[in-house]
Amino acid sequence: MNLTDKVTIPTQVMARTVGDETVILDLTSGTYYGLDPVGARMWQLMGEGQTLAAICDTLLDEYEVTREALEGDILRLTEELRAKGLASPA
């Protein structure tokens, strides 16, 4: 995936926040994945249909981080979610 891509969240995937953690669960396979608050914000923006580049721009305004580090984090999280079947390229 690259930063111009958007992410699709399958209909069988649900997310719930418990305390400071957001848990993503695939109801069909039982696969789950935990997100910290920054990862949860990325997930929220992915669900809004934004490109990964737009998500990066939004998060740069919200967190003190370099663009390079954030782009790497976004691409890494997206790839982990894709590998687990919790998200796919749109």
Please report, for each region that a protein language model flagged, where it lies by residue.
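Acidic, low-complexity/disordered tracts enriched in E/D and polar residues
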Residues: 1-40, 44, 90
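Long, charge-rich, low-complexity alpha-helical segments
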Residues: 31-90
